[in-house]
Swiss-Prot record:
Chain ranges of the Protein kinase domain: 570-823
Name of this protein: Serine/threonine-protein kinase pakB
Lineage: Eukaryota, Amoebozoa, Evosea, Eumycetozoa, Dictyostelia
Basic residues compositional bias, start-end: 470-485
One GO molecular-function entry: protein serine kinase activity
Places the protein is found: Membrane; Cytoplasm, Cytoskeleton
Residue spans of biased composition, Pro residues class: 24-35, 57-74, 181-191
Assembly and oligomerization: Interacts with rac1A, rac1B, rac1C, racA, racB, racC and racF1.
Native organism: Dictyostelium discoideum
UniProt PTM comment: Autophosphorylated at Ser-8. This may stimulate interaction with GTP-bound Rac family members which then further stimulates autophosphorylation and kinase activity.
Purpose: Regulator of the myosin I component of the cytoskeleton: required for regulation of cytokinesis, phagocytosis and pinocytosis.
Lineage top rank: taxon: Eukaryota
Secreted found in the keyword field: no
Length: 852
């Protein structure tokens, strides 16, 4: 009686749950395809994954009405129907793990037979449309329900059979009973997998201790038509792929009216395991963290059915395996969390790697081409603006496109050099603040230049002049002997062996200094003899007598003096000029009480090579038309170059006062002749000045003319008999130099012709044009004639014309021009003194006027 009451109570609760489930909206997820199974009675069914397999079912326990026990079915024998009312739970048998592959179902599961012998609805149909599995026939729900040995109820696909059905991934139910949350489910071990109760019908029994009667024996389940689909099959939830069933597990139970899928777990067929509870989600917003729900409708359905679960004390199903999306999200969250530290680490590494240093091997290659239709290609916008502002017309571009490209290339290089100099100046200021010399940081190994003599000389020893006639070598034996002795002493000093009379280091140093002083004096005497009488004959400047030198490297420290310049010169100094290379001061030499010009140049990686070149050439050149080099000194992060002081200033100072002081042809011829003598001398040494202009022609108070500023000078060698580097001042540059073609010493002759026109007209041609336009005109149009042709003689005009010949082969050498008729009209040095004095007076008057 008590059992029948419980059955009736169970039926009433089931009907109430079914009615409540009918009011909820149908789910929008599809069920997993059923798995096809081969039953023992010869019929086949489908599991939830759609794969066909044969699974033995555990033998049912004998019921009280039928004391005779049924034998356990085998895979090859047809199963017998279980008794109507089993008196004890049936033992379960562990099933081997069978991989399940989801496929599309081709037919529906067979109809099940209820206890009355009539065919009930499909176990998948749901009359309420809820996410659970309720019976389509509520009247037969009790007869079709089965109770496992743990007291859990479950629904099955086959009446009376205990074949396992693979687990389906669904959302775990939400249980809000008494506001408590069950503990998280324990993780099953490989030896103990969650067991699932066998299913019998589409009835959901809410009691735990009352077994449901099995279907009538010997009733063969009917099959659905191939095209028939159980009601509500399309609304069943469609989860991810069904995982493989591990050994010892059974099929999940189906058919809970409220959408829950209670699962009972047993580790062995004899010893039952307690039901597994699931962590609950108290809010639909957080349900994606605690459950495997994929839609808001499932969350709502779970929340609506919590009370039914609590009232029936039904055990909740364990959570299904995690969805891949959740794992991906967790990986992304983990990756994003870890990326915070990795990004910080990268930023720290970047900060550590960042250091202020001097640029090296700076290149800024811009390839510009010209198309007749589209115009310039590859030209930056800023260069387009410069090209438009330079005054170069479109007709000029079309007619001389290659020349325009060469001119732009030169202008780009000039801009790059200027930017590099500004960057070096900024770095120099930073190094001055740190108290470290710039040349020590930027240039641990100073650049070298090719010089004539391979033997390194001390700082106070001059290089032997390369243009010595052969007879002087035979006459001047003592310098050669002293030179050999000094080399031997240097070799002995390096090997710590003293071959002289003195055996101590002090005597060695004094002997070396004494021999160096004797050599210096004798070389000076030799140079004076060479520059006196016959110094300008053709043999002296004959290039055929001077072979090309080999390239020999020398560093800056081999050229500078180790003495303290503050002890050699007076404290008082007067600034007389300032240029791009540095500032020029006038000081008094304490030893001779003569005025000396000191050029203070900051050292950086950009100008180091130019400085070394300038010092090397000035130190090895001794000529009356070249500025006398005294010595150079390293002071902090700058280089002091001491040279001869020229009281008359530069030639530009006279040309600036053109309104009050105008040079005549005799004076112009004198300056040109003296300049040509200096050029012929350096050309005989296979050197190029490359920056001949009025700013680099220094004048003495006595009217002497000397070349200065060898910063752009170049040494021609056997490996470099011509140069292609584009350097110089735009208005004085030769066309072949502008275009970067192979050029030689004749570029200095072109610059001399421009300087001659500058002395006649106070400025070089195209001075009123922008530099880019001037370069273009020099290359394409050449140099125009003198403005006032009647004012100048034919010899002067011919001299200028020969110097400015665009054909390099027809342009004469310096030694040839020295014999030009125009130079024979030159005055002496005294004839230039009045112009120098008048220019100084005009400059002083102008400065006083500007102050007041």
């Amino acid at each position: 009686m008590e059992q029948s009451k419980r059955v009736s109570m169970m039926r009433e609760k089931f009907e109430a749950q079914s009615n409540e489930a009918e009011s909820s909206p149908p789910p929008n997820r599809k069920p997993p395809p059923p798995n096809k199974r081969v039953q023992t009675n010869g019929t086949s069914s489908l599991n939830s994954s759609g794969s066909s397999f044969v699974s033995p079912s555990p033998s049912p326990s004998p019921s009280p009405q039928q004391p005779v026990k049924r034998p356990l079915p085998s895979p090859g024998v047809n199963k017998q129907a279980p008794p109507a009312l089993p008196t004890q739970p049936r033992p379960q048998q562990q099933q081997p793990e069978i991989p399940v592959r989801p496929t599309t179902p081709t037919r529906t599961p067979p109809n099940l037979i209820n206890s009355n012998g009539t065919s009930g609805g499909s176990g998948f149909s749901s009359s309420s449309g809820n996410s659970g599995y309720s019976s389509s026939n509520n009247n037969n729900s009790n007869s079709n329900s089965s109770i496992n040995m743990n007291g859990n109820h479950s629904n099955g696909l086959n009446g009376g059979s205990s074949n396992p059905v693979p687990m389906r991934k669904v959302s775990s139910p939400i249980n809000i009973a008494n506001g408590t949350t069950p503990p998280p489910p324990p993780q099953p071990t490989p030896s103990q997998q969650p067991q699932q109760s066998p299913s019998s019908a589409s009835h959901n029994n809410t009691q735990h201790n009352i077994p449901s009667p099995p279907p009538l024996p010997n009733n063969k389940p009917k099959k659905l038509a191939p095209t028939a689909v159980p009601a509500g099959l399309g609304s069943i939830i469609g989860g991810p792929k069904t995982p493989a069933i591990s050994p010892g597990s059974t099929s999940p139970s189906l058919g809970s009216s409220n959408g829950n899928i209670p699962i009972s777990t047993t580790s062995t067929p004899i010893t039952p395991t307690p039901p597994i509870s699931v962590p609950l989600a108290t809010s639909p917003n957080n349900s994606h963290k605690d459950s495997i729900s994929n839609s808001n409708s499932n969350n709502n359905n779970n929340n609506n059915n919590n009370n039914n679960n609590n009232s029936s004390n039904a055990t909740t199903s364990p959570p299904s395996p995690p969805v891949s999306n959740v794992g991906n999200k967790q990986d992304e969250e983990k990756k994003g969390f870890l990326s915070i530290f990795t990004n910080k680490k990268k930023n720290k590494d970047k900060k550590k790697e960042f250091s202020v240093g001097s640029p090296f091997n700076v290149k800024h290659n811009i390839h510009v081409n010209y198309h007749s239709v589209t115009g310039f290609e590859g030209l930056p916008k800023e260069w387009e603006v410069i090209l438009q502002s330079s005054g170069i017309t479109r007709e000029d571009v079309v007619e001389h496109s290659e020349v325009v490209i060469d001119v732009l290339d030169f202008h780009m290089q000039q801009q790059q050099q200027q930017a590099q100099q500004e960057q070096q100046a900024l770095m120099q200021k930073q190094m001055q603040q740190s108290g470290i010399p710039a040349h020590m940081l930027n240039n641990p190994k100073p650049p070298t230049i090719p010089i004539r003599d391979a033997n390194k000389q001390p700082h106070n020893q001059l290089q032997p002049t390369p243009h010595q006639p052969p007879q002087h070598h035979h006459q001047q034996q003592p310098p050669q002997q002293h030179h050999h002795q000094q080399q031997q002493q240097q070799h002995n000093n390096n090997n710590n062996n003293n071959n002289n009379n003195n055996n101590n280091n002090n005597n060695q140093q004094s002997a070396q200094q004494q021999s160096a002083g004797i050599l210096s004096q004798q070389q000076e005497q030799q140079l004076e003899e060479m520059m006196c009488g016959g110094a300008y004959d053709d043999e002296q400047y004959d290039l055929n007598n001077q072979p090309l030198p080999d390239e020999t490297n020398v560093s800056l420290y081999d050229l500078v003096s180790q003495e303290d310049p503050t002890k050699l010169f007076g404290e008082g100094s007067t600034k007389i000029g300032e240029g791009a290379a540095g500032e020029v001061f006038v000081v008094t030499q304490l030893k001779t009480n003569n005025k000396v010009a000191i050029k203070k140049m900051p050292l950086n990686q950009q100008n180091m090579k130019l400085i070394v070149t300038e010092i090397g050439i000035m130190k090895s050149c001794r000529h009356q038309n070249i500025i006398d080099y005294i010595d150079s000194y390293l002071v902090g992060d700058s280089l002091w170059v001491a040279m001869e002081f020229m009281g008359g200033g530069c030639l530009t100072e006279i040309l600036e006062q053109f309104n009050s002081v105008k040079l005549v042809e005799a004076q112009i011829a004198y300056v040109c002749a003296e300049t040509l003598k200096g050029l012929a001398y350096i050309h005989s040494q296979h050197r190029i000045h490359r920056d001949i202009k009025s700013d680099n022609i220094l004048l003495g108070s006595d009217g002497s003319v000397k070349l200065a500023d060898f910063g752009y000078a170049a040494q021609l060698t056997k490996s470099k008999q011509k140069r292609v580097t584009i350097v110089g001042t735009p208005y004085w540059m030769a066309p072949e130099l502008i275009r970067g073609q192979n050029y030689d010493r004749k570029v200095d002759i072109w610059s001399l012709g421009i300087m001659a026109m500058e002395m006649a007209e106070s400025e070089p041609p195209y001075m009123s044009f922008p530099p880019l336009r001037a370069l273009f005109l020099i290359t394409t149009k050449g140099i125009p004639d003198l403005k006032d042709q009647n004012k100048w003689s034919d010899d002067f005009k011919d001299f200028v014309k020969k110097c400015l010949d665009k054909d390099v082969e027809n342009r004469p050498e310096a030694k040839v021009l020295l014999n030009h008729p125009f130079l024979k009209t030159a005055c002496n040095s005294n004839g230039l003194v009045p112009a120098i004095m008048e220019a100084k007076k005009a400059k002083e008057a102008h400065s006083k006027f500007s102050i007041h």
